[in-house]
Swiss-Prot record:
InterPro entries: MFS, MFS_dom, MFS_trans_sf. It comes from Claviceps purpurea (strain 20.1). Keywords: Membrane, Transmembrane, Transmembrane helix, Transport. This is MFS-type transporter CPUR_05422. Residues 38-47 have a biased composition (Pro residues).
Length: 577
């Protein structure tokens, strides 16, 4: 690695901000991983601070609890929205309640990766939790729709930090060989949260008030906050400890962030509005997409021209497994959201069940995902080669997706359940593969940025492909129902997002045609999920075959006689920051 040789050279004159930041990042964190030793074979030091099993268990419990709260927060609102709109008389704001959270979470994900790489992971995670809890309190107490939307936006920012921070906490605490089981459990926690989120929201809304969907985060989030404060051990000196305040600010890639955040905002707004609020050829959509493209190109240029302070350093993309992992994350995330979002719509339209029952019909997919996440973690910890399980899991996932594209009006319930189980089980086996690849192939200082890149891909793909699916569904319905009596009225219902309203609006003799149109249109949506599942197979197949059970080779020392920087190396568990 070029950075290692650069560390052996003495510095002359005043260093630039980027040089200081680069040296601080690499030298400070690399000293955490390997003990100073004479030339020759060196045994790497376990990068995880030593602490009691009880303290580690409490920390992991708090990390899982924080992740559970964030995952539930994404879905708990779905069953509460009718009551929220009734209280605020804000039917026109419904779209913002969910999208603003996803927008800010996605937009700030990469920035938090940079923060975790440069500053104390413990402090950044605690601040993220505080932001999330404060936003939850604001949402619960919001006097009007505008305040509620602001609270959801801030909640998304805190969630972005918690998503990446929980994995970073595991990296700092658990040895690499033992992480697959822990991350498998984390995947199971996220899957469980997705299942019960709407149920919890419905229970609070019906029995108490929808505001408790957000107040409930405060006591449990407070417990996680206290446990992380006391039990999350990180090195005393952060990579940015030697930088001045000005240098710390400059190291955060302010130009890149200023370009990236509005680019994502433009993209998600265009996807939210395109084909529904405005036609795709409307001037507002064209301006948003054009501005998005310009900002993204400018962001890439900044990352290339200023690599030492880049939010996504180009050196990350020099690792084959990182690029393959990013592709896999996008593929799995988009396929997951396509099916999780549109399977309930299939049940509500083709099978005629209500919203609650359609969620129950999704349980085979989600339960198999939870089980496979746990099984995958155990197998990865036993086998060591995560790529093998990733290829197998993504292949099973693709087969399940392909079978679900055959759903029609006559398909049996047994096949509906079986195909979901196949898809969910394959997805669960492959779900953690990108994160394990990043942790294995990247130097430890760059792991937070790599993890943030994976979460960014997952969130961005979810936002994009749910919107893509909605546009495919609407366009397919319009083309298949053209010529039916009352088409203009049906067209307005389709474009306004009405699902069962379209079926209820047609006379009895036309219902079968509408059901067939829905079934065929949703097949086309599922084909998109199949295509992305196949991309996941390509992504996992391109990953390097690394064994997490083998200890990494120590970094090469400087050539004999070369000047070196001397610095004390900590060999004890570091204290709090």
């Amino acid at each position: 690695m070029s950075a290692m040789s650069a560390m052996g050279k003495p510095e002359h004159g005043s260093a630039t901000t980027s040089d200081l930041e680069h040296r601080a990042t690499e030298s400070s964190l690399e000293k955490q991983d390997v003990e100073a030793a004479p030339p020759g074979p060196v045994k790497p030091v376990d990068p995880s601070p030593k602490q009691s099993t009880l303290k580690t268990t409490l920390l992991l419990a708090s990390v899982f609890l924080a992740m559970f709260l964030v995952a539930v927060d994404r879905t708990i609102i779905s069953t509460a929205i009718p009551s929220i709109t009734n209280d605020y008389n804000s039917l026109n704001d419904v779209g913002w309640y969910g999208s603003i959270y996803l927008l800010t979470c996605c937009a700030f994900q990469l920035l938090f990766g940079k923060l975790y790489a440069m500053y104390s992971a413990r402090v950044v995670l605690l601040v993220s939790l505080v932001i999330f809890l404060a936003a939850s309190a604001l949402c619960g107490a919001a006097p009007n729709s505008e305040a509620f939307i602001v609270g959801r936006a801030i909640s998304g920012v805190g969630s972005a930090g918690i998503f990446a921070g929980n994995i970073v906490a595991i990296v700092h605490t658990i040895p690499l060989a033992k992480r697959p089981k822990i991350q498998g459990l984390m995947g199971a926690v996220m899957g469980l949260a997705t299942i019960i989120g709407p149920l919890i929201g419905g229970a609070f809304t019906t029995r108490v008030t929808w505001r408790w969907c957000f107040y409930i985060n405060l006591p449990f989030g407070g417990l996680a906050l206290v446990a992380i404060f006391f039990y999350f051990k990180v090195p005393n000196r952060s990579p940015a400890a030697d930088l001045s305040l000005k240098q710390k600010i400059l190291s955060l890639d302010i130009p890149g962030t200023i370009l990236l955040v509005p680019a994502i905002v433009c993209l998600l707004l265009a996807l939210q509005w395109g084909g529904q609020v405005y036609d795709w050829n409307n001037k507002y959509i064209i301006v948003l997409l054009t501005l998005m493209a310009v900002l993204f190109v400018a962001f890439i240029a900044v990352q290339i021209c200023l690599p030492k302070t880049a939010t996504v350093p180009p050196r990350l993309l020099m690792h084959r497994s990182v690029v393959a992992g990013f592709l896999t994350t996008i593929a799995i995330g988009s396929a997951q959201y396509i099916f999780v979002y549109y399977i309930p719509i299939w049940f509500q339209t083709v099978r005629g069940v209500n919203a609650v029952d359609s969620g129950i019909q999704l349980l085979p997919l989600m339960i198999s995902f939870v089980v496979a996440s746990i099984v995958g973690g155990l197998l990865n910890q036993r086998i060591g080669y995560y790529t093998a399980l990733g290829i197998f899991g993504s292949s099973v996932m693709a087969v399940g997706a392909g079978l679900m594209t055959t759903w029609n009006l006559e398909i049996s319930q047994g096949k509906v359940i079986g195909y979901q189980i196949l898809f969910g089980f394959g997805m669960g086996l492959a779900f953690q593969t990108p994160n394990l690849a990043v942790q294995t192939v990247l130097p430890r200082p760059e792991v937070p940025m790599g993890i943030a890149l994976m979460f960014f891909g997952q969130l961005l793909s979810a936002a994009i492909f749910v919107a893509v699916g909605q546009n495919i569904l609407a366009n397919q319905l319009l083309s298949r129902l053209a010529g039916i009596d009352g088409f203009e009225h049906l067209k307005s219902l389709i474009l306004s997002g009405g699902v069962t309203a379209v079926i209820d609006a047609v006379p009895e003799e036309s219902k079968h045609r509408v059901l067939v149109a829905y079934s065929d249109a949703l097949q086309q949506v599922f084909i998109v999920g199949l295509a992305m599942s196949c991309v996941g197979v390509v992504g996992t197949s391109c990953m390097e075959w690394k064994n997490i059970l083998k200890k990494p080779a120590p970094p090469a020392g400087p050539p004999a006689g070369a000047p070196t920087e001397s610095a004390p190396v900590e060999t004890k568990a570091a204290g709090h920051t």
